[in-house]
Amino acid sequence: MKLIENTEFGGERPLFASHDIHLDNVTIREGESAIKECSNIVATNCRFEGNYPFWHVHGFTIDNCYFAVGGRSALWYSDHLTMKNTVIDAPKMFREMNDIDIENVEINDADEIFWRCNRINIKNLKLHEGTYPFMFSKDIRIDGLESDSKYVFQYVKNAEIHNARITTKDAFWEVEDVTIYDSELNGEYLGWHSRNLRLVNCHISGEQPLCYAHGLVLENCMFDASCDRAFEYTTLNADIKGHITNIKNPTSGIIVADSIGSITLDENIKAPADCEIKTRN
């Protein structure tokens, strides 16, 4: 592997079609597509300021690097990436990618990141600002996530998430086969139109959670007092720890809680309208 260190590049495609190179303490200045159509690339202690640096790259590692605002749309149409100990201030990262491993990364403009990506493994990720992270992605495994980005995990399939703290409305809309463990989920309209969403040991806050869901499972979950009109038109099996403020027109299944503030079953309930709702003795 060729070592390139303590230098900088700018302009158009300065390292186009490079293979088997290690960039250390390199700055990519203003320009486009610095490391395009490359393979077997290692970047350590580097700074990226130009647009689209890693497009169509196959097999690469990014460690202890920084992506400035100008380094937007930096990682598209690539595969087999390992990224560690990196800070990103640029939006629209990770698009149409496969086989991504992330550890100890902070993204400060998480706008439209991780779109249409497959096989993502994440440990300790912080997301700030931006909209729609993880849209249309699948096969995701996460342990450790802090996010205040809007509308996360919409249209996601086959995900397992541990130890997350997520604050946004409209999270997990239209997801399929997603399980969330030991997490804090804050925001209105959580998990609407989901299929096979499972929450284990989670704390939920925000109004109208988990409506229009099919095959919802809750295990030992807690609800904040703000959670009114929960489970409208949802089929579910729910084990709720503590109190829930209000349950409205669930379609079918079973709900067990320690206490329930109120239950709304009115003329608008949908068939089969046979959900069993009870409190523990």
Protein language model regions, located:
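Long, distal/terminal scaffolding or interaction modules
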Residues: M1-N281
